[in-house]
Structures are given as C-alpha cells and as structure tokens.
Amino acid sequence: MKMHFCIPVSQQRSDALGGRYVLYSVHLDGFLFCRVRYSQLHGWNEQLRRVFGNCLPPFPPKYYLAMTTAMADERRDQLEQYLQNVTMDPNVLRSDVFVEFLKLAQLNTFDIATKKAYLDIFLPNEQSIRIEIITSDTAERVLEVVSHKIGLCRELLGYFGLFLIRFGKEGKLSVVKKLADFELPYVSLGSSEVENCKVGLRKWYMAPSLDSVLMDCRVAVDLLYMQAIQDIEKGWAKPTQAQRQKLEAFQKEDSQTKFLELAREVRHYGYLQLDPCTCDYPESGSGAVLSVGNNEISCCITLPDSQTQDIVFQMSRVKCWQVTFLGTLLDTDGPQRTLNQNLELRFQYSEDSCWQWFVIYTKQAFLLSSCLKKMISEKMVKLAAENTEMQIEVPEQSKSKKYHIQQSQQKDYSSFLSRKSKIKIAKDDCVFGNIKEEDL
C-alpha cells in the first residue's frame, strides 16, 4: 500500500551565485520529512532504475523551456504521486539506494551532522532506557539496538515499532505517529513541533490474537504486560468491574500470563485510541472518541443532547478511505515551515446494502489511516496462511483462491487528497513561470 507522502508546497530559492531553483517540501504522515530539489529526485530515480529497471512508476519529465505556474504545479503533483507509488514495492523500500538517499535528505534538511548521540526510548511503563546511536540510524536500526539492550528476541521485532508520543498533563498520552523504518528517530524527534514529544516503544499490530505469537519470549511478555496496564490506566481498554478486580488480583500476584489472558477479553484491549475529535454523524461537528483495532473502528459519539452513542464499523464493510488536507500553509520563512494540521479522514462503508461516507476530522488522520492499513495487511496475511492450509488439503481448489489473495494484497484502499481550492498559498509558495530547467 502507498505511504503517506505528500508535497503540499514548493518554494522558490536562490543559490549562492544568484541562480534560482525550486525546493519541494516533502511531508510524511503530515509532518515535514525533508526538502529536495527536482534534480536530486531525478538523480535518485535514475539510481533506482539501474537497480529495479522499468518496474518503477513514471518519473516527471524534464522541461527544457520555461515552466509556467501551472506546469510547476503539475510537476509538484507528479512528484507527489511518484513518491507514493514507488513506496508500494517492499523491495524498493528495503533497498540501500532508497534508504540512503532519504537518510541524507533528512540530515541535510535539518542541518544535522552524522555523529554519535544518545536517545531516550520510553517503554510502555513510561520508564526510559538510554541508548547510544548514530544520528543517521534509521528507526529499523534503532529498534534493533533497543531490542538488543532489553533482550527482545530478534525474530519478534516486526511486532513492535517506534512511535512519536506526546506526554500531556495528568498522565495523558497521545500517539503522534508511527516512525517509518527508513525514518531517522533522532532527526524526527528533534524537528518535531509537538510539545513534550518522546520516542516510545509499543507493539505494532491491531489483532489482539497475535499476542499468542509473543508469549514464549519473556521480554515480549513484559512489554505486553506493561502496555496492557498502561492502556487500562489511561482508559483505552475498558474492563468491567469484575474484570478489573480479577486483573488487579493477577497484578498483585505478578501473574503476567493470567493477566494477559484475561486482558484479551477486555473491551478495546490492544486498540489504539485517538485524541477527541469531531465527525459528521449524526450531524457535522459532533464530538467523537475513536478506538481502532481487532478489525473495527469503534466510535463513541457525543450527541447534541450530550448523550453518547457507540457505533462500530467493521473493516470487512469498509470499501476505501482517503485523507484530505483542509488546512492553510504557515509562514514558509519560519524555522519549520510545516502545515496547519487540519485533516479529515473519510471512509466508504456499507450499511444496509448502501454505501455511505463517514467523515472524521482529526489531526491524527494519518495515524488512523496507518492503523486501517495495518488491519488490512494483517487480514491478508491471515487469509494467505489459511490458504496455505487449504492448498495442502485441496491443491486444485486453492490455486484460484491464492491468486485472488495475492491480487488483493496489491489493492490500494487508501489515498491522500490535497484539497487545493481550500489552501491559502503563502507569498513565496508559488513557482513562477520564468524559472527554467537549468535553474533546478
């Protein structure tokens, strides 16, 4: 599936010799990721083509005449589509050519030198461990260092992830974003405009049943236990009074296995809860709290009469979704030059044999989209595993089903839409028609 890359703004810049060029601000999951020139992206594409050949998506062509504003805007759209499409191939995502270019782009954008540094990683019990890293270490590498330090089985790394987490008042926490494997945690944390933001370790799967895969690793069980306690304390998981009493008894006994077995029966166990937001049901501006997990989106909606209503959307009935940028551009001469995070996520849902759109307005729209994609991918893995079992029992019948599953894995359920008619362009955000290709 596509990653959440977008280029909402391009800027005209002058080099030391007075020449002009265009700088594209690339955002990932709604946050500034790097700034690059067309020539840099073009060179990167050429490197990728030498490795992967013609399986890459088309790259925007060079212009040898002066570009009009419309042409420049079209190029920006094409570069955005290229970044989204090229990341659909997992082989490209894991390649050295892909990762090394983006590492350098992040470091150069935020003027960070490659050197040794220390990074605090917060565990689910909100205690931290300090690790020594290189500022150019990717999230994948940092996760390996963390796992080695705490003794987590290497083969279980894929079930955990690094997140930017905001710690608020009165013990509240908010998951800001999941760090992509190729992101540099040191850079992403340092460039974040979110107050009290830390890098945290959390499990990264949406199906509570996957806990069973981790139960033979003591450290993994410790992490699950910590996160389960934290989720219950924060109100993300909602045990009944009877369940709470039993859980407290198991906690006093330090019986982690029994605690987790019961926790899996708790409502919203293993779900990720978003910050309070608004939605368009039953009317626009209705308050909502969303919990995502176990193949569903659970919404607690505040009605106009202050009563609450719980609505559950099953992922099996979600056809597609898209994230739309509704905000305005901030001052492009500021230190961060990011976006005013006004986002919506809308998904198409089947209700009584009729497809309807449900709209959620939240700054965590990209995180929500990542959770939906994760649930889809987990479902595909499960179907593939079941298909393998069927293949052993009924080889001929399973062939067609396997092909269908493989095709489904390539389906793109999500999209990013930049609603440009609603974007207020800052003074220097436009690319003027007298900029030529050699200036880029």
From Swiss-Prot:
Function: May be involved in protein trafficking.
SUPFAM superfamilies, per the entry: PX domain
Protein family according to the UniProt entry: Belongs to the sorting nexin family.
PX domain segment(s): 1-109
Pfam families (UniProt xref): PX, SNX17-27-31_F1_FERM, SNX17-31_F2_FERM, SNX17_FERM_C
Name assigned to this protein: Sorting nexin-31
Taxonomy, superkingdom: Eukaryota
Transmembrane keyword on record: no
GO molecular function: phosphatidylinositol binding
Assembly and binders: Interacts with CCDC22, CCDC93, VPS26C and VPS35L, associates with the retriever and CCC complexes.
Family matches, as Gene3D superfamilies: 1.20.80.60, Phosphatidylinositol 3-kinase Catalytic Subunit, Chain A, domain 1 (3.10.20.90), Phox-like domain (3.30.1520.10), Pleckstrin-homology domain (PH domain)/Phosphotyrosine-binding domain (PTB) (2.30.29.30)
GO cellular component, one term: early endosome
PROSITE patterns hit by this protein: PX
InterPro entries, alphabetized: PH-like_dom_sf, PX_dom, PX_dom_sf, SNX17-31_FERM_F1, SNX17-31_FERM_F2, SNX17/31_FERM
Species this chain originates from: Homo sapiens
GO BP, one annotated term: endocytic recycling
Primary gene name: SNX31
Keyword annotations of the record: Protein transport, Transport
